[in-house]
């Protein structure tokens, strides 16, 4: 028999969104060869927090990776989140 584990959707775990986004952004920066991640602007953080994340963590990961890649600037924080 298998146990069932209920994990609430990301939209119900607002406190997890920014730490997870930072984690995935740092990983993407390493993959791109950046020496560090400059962070997200207030505008970008608000976009991340306000979105409903129907695709949960997998969607968050993809959005963050795409946004960091398209931003393309190591020394400036990401301002535009590409949803």
Description of each model-found segment:
Residues 1-83:
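Nucleotide-binding/hydrolysis machinery
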